[in-house]
């Protein structure tokens, strides 16, 4: 559980990075972070991952099983990397919905994809992952890439994703996770808490947002815990694949 109670009448709290904040404030604080970083989000992704995020996303697409005519939901779709690829895969008879709770990220994604000529089979929706505004049994595939760690009630979000999937539909969760060896873990800590905020300061003049992003990664459930959460939410055949020594993990579950 993410929340904590300090007394019977106290509002539940949850983590915002390493800080505990009232649950009602987390979404607003996360929104402020992504309003701040939206304009240079793609540039920072390339700089901070050395371009590796493109390989991680490519692997997710390969495991998605998406094909012509499918309906895909890309949650926390941000600037549209996955949506662009899925748009090509589903073709004119399919549909991709790019959903993001953050209006700034959604605008950047819409503008970027329109500039690239991606339209026709793509819809943009501002939506909360915990309360997805879509019918039951609607999508063949749901993805959430580097977004689940920012969700306040992850269990609610996973159940919401299960609800909108068709039976046999796939959920893919691509997220930063826990390195699988001590050497990588130490190097990753140094990188996250020194280099990431420094680059944030130099490129976006915002070190605090990138400090939060580093902290949010550490507070995210590890590979086995997230697998158990997906099973508890109702997913079947849940597996995960570690990438870059566990820095990133791709979880996949099927709706029974």
From Swiss-Prot:
EC number: 2.1.1.163, 2.1.1.201
Positions of S-adenosyl-L-methionine binding: 79, 100, 128-129
Keywords: Menaquinone biosynthesis, Methyltransferase, S-adenosyl-L-methionine, Transferase, Ubiquinone biosynthesis
An annotated Gene Ontology molecular function: demethylmenaquinone methyltransferase activity
One Pfam family named in its UniProt record: Ubie_methyltran
Catalytic activity entry: a 2-demethylmenaquinol + S-adenosyl-L-methionine = a menaquinol + S-adenosyl-L-homocysteine + H(+); a 2-methoxy-6-(all-trans-polyprenyl)benzene-1,4-diol + S-adenosyl-L-methionine = a 5-methoxy-2-methyl-3-(all-trans-polyprenyl)benzene-1,4-diol + S-adenosyl-L-homocysteine + H(+)
Principal EC category: transferase
Family label: Belongs to the class I-like SAM-binding methyltransferase superfamily. MenG/UbiE family.
Official protein name in the record: Ubiquinone/menaquinone biosynthesis C-methyltransferase UbiE
Gene from which the chain derives: ubiE
């Amino acid at each position: 559980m993410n929340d904590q109670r300090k007394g019977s009448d106290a509002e539940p709290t949850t983590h915002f990075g390493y800080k505990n904040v009232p649950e009602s404030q987390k979404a607003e604080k996360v929104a402020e972070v992504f309003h701040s970083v939206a304009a240079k989000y793609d540039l920072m992704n390339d700089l901070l991952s050395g371009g590796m995020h493109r390989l991680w996303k490519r692997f997710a697409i390969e495991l998605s099983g998406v094909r012509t005519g499918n309906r895909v939901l890309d949650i926390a779709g941000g600037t549209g990397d996955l949506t662009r690829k899925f748009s090509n895969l589903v073709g004119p008879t399919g549909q991709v919905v790019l959903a993001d709770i953050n209006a700034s990220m959604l605008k950047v994604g819409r503008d970027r994809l329109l500039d690239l000529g991606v339209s026709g089979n793509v819809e943009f929706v501002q939506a909360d992952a915990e309360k997805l505004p879509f019918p039951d049994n609607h999508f063949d595939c749901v993805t959430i890439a580097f977004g689940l760690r920012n969700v306040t009630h992850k269990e609610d979000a996973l159940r919401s994703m299960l609800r909108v999937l068709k039976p046999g539909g796939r959920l893919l969760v691509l997220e930063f996770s826990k390195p699988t060896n001590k050497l990588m873990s130490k190097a990753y800590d140094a990188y996250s808490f020194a280099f990431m905020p420094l680059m944030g300061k130099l490129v976006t003049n915002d070190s605090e947002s990138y400090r939060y992003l580093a902290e949010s990664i550490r507070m995210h459930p590890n590979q086995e815990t997230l697998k158990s959460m997906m099973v508890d939410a109702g997913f079947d055949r849940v597996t995960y694949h570690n990438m870059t020594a566990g820095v990133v993990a791709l979880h996949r579950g099927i709706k029974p």
